[in-house]
Amino acid sequence: MKSKNKLIVILFLVFLVVCRCSKSVEGFEKNIDDLTFSKTQKWGKFEWSAADKLNRTNQNILRNLPIIPFPKNSSYQTKTELADIVKKRKELNEKHMKQIVAEREWKNTIKQFGVKVDEGKRLDNYIFQKVQPIHLTIKRHFDRVRPSFLDKKIVPVIRIPAHGAYPSGHSTEAWSLAFCLSDKYPERKNKYYAIANNIATNRERAGLHYKSDSDYGKLLARKILDLVGSENHPLLGKY
């Protein structure tokens, strides 16, 4: 009888431990999901104020864009993306590193596409007057924490920009260039797409972005150009 009572006590204690562990895990995941860029870093004044300066045209575009939430910090998808960043970091080579450093500046990003001078001016205007203000506004809305704050194995190779992760600005802007140029030079589409994809992936290799940041940036680039319309196309319209 004593042995039976002892077994019951042991089983009860095990049950309590399991319950506490379960609650601890739930609490931990809840805390992880509460992490944002604003709670871990400071927004830049320019980046934060972009949303307050949207003109009417950009506001109309924004209203018609697909606003898709990013995966929760505790989600399986985010954990998979974090592991993917760690893997990409291990594969980082000297060529990638040089590209990552150079691509911090816009002139080095657009240069890769080999645009003509007049095309460059039109594309500059499109990116800085349309694309950038819109994606910065969406970044502010989502305020996604950077990957290195969810996985300490991720150490960014360059300074983290002063704004949230989602969507990737580099991806949005690079794919905007690729889509615009492909409309004018369809025979070079594969080349432009490869350049844009590498620029976006470099930000993941650098430890700055999740894959979902890059994917959403690509989607936004396509949708923004579609909403601008053929009449106002940066290279083919009166824009």
Predicted regions, residues:
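A structural-propensity feature for long, helix-poor, extended segments
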Residues: L208-Y216
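Hydrophobic alpha-helical bundle signature of multipass membrane enzymes
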Residues: V25-H209, K223, L227-S230
